[in-house]
Amino acid sequence: MVDLVARDVERDAAIRSVRFAAGTVIAGEAGVGKTSLAGSVADTLAERGVPVVRVLATAAGRAIPFAALGPLLPVDARDFQPALVPGMVMRSLAGLATRATPNGKPPVKPLLLVDDAQLLDDHSAAALLSVVHQHAARALVTVRLGGRPPDAVTALWKDGLLDRIDLQPLDLDEAGALLRSRLGGDVATVTTRALWDHSQGNALYLTELVRFRAGHRSALGGRWRVVVAGRHRGAAPSRRAAATPDRGRHPGRGRGARRAGAG
């Protein structure tokens, strides 16, 4: 189960889209949490009995026709004409729906999760578009901004076939919630703001900052604080800061007693 923090609104919106509409595209910059959000949505539907197929597009696979759709294709699929492959994909999805349904009940339409769809090869992208057009599966698609996705991928939202969620960087309060979850306790306001500033709200970078030389929790239950070396300010986020316990501040004393994200 994906551990998702501070994305409740977007998660609820994505679940509604895949349950009551054709599905959704989750778009955003690298590291903002697209994959985690999509994974959490897929896990939720799987717990409710929806069959889930997870597909990951890669830069290496982009040169190979239908590479990303391997989980839905027979091993000899590349021997067939490309025009026949989308039909194979849809038959495979229909088979999943039938196998997941108790006798006498309507088939449960599966969820097709496509991660990093901007890296799909053109053939796989066209097959995905056909699946959505034919309502053969619910679709949950992540797209990194700044790339050049295939036209068939951009058509998913430009033609109104799927909803689109633009995932923004975390705000200060959301960053505080993530830090409390990762560190397992309250975080000094100054620490939350420093890490949020350094990461610019990027969830992946923020998590890396926490992991980098995180130290140990204070035995007195002190809040966490951050030590930022000036020479690291221009470095990559994972090298800028080290999280250490705020031993000088205790719950109920001074400014450090304010809850993370409050200022």
Describe every region a protein language model picked out:
Residues 2-15, 85:
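N-terminal pre-P-loop "Q-motif" helix
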Residues 14, 256-262:
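Short alpha-helical "packing" element that flanks the helix-turn-helix/winged-helix DNA-binding module
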Residues 20-24:
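Pre-Walker A (Motif I) flank of P-loop NTPase domains
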Residues 29:
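P-loop (Walker A) phosphate-binding loop of NTP-binding proteins
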Residues 32, 36-110, 119:
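Conserved phosphate-binding/catalytic loops and adjacent sensor/switch elements of nucleotide-binding enzymes
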Residues 65, 85, 116, 120-124, ...:
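Helical "lid/switch" subdomain of P-loop NTPase nucleotide-binding domains
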Residues 78-79, 99, 140, 146-200, ...:
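Helix-loop-helix "sensor" segment of P-loop NTPases
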Residues 110-142:
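Conserved Walker B catalytic segment
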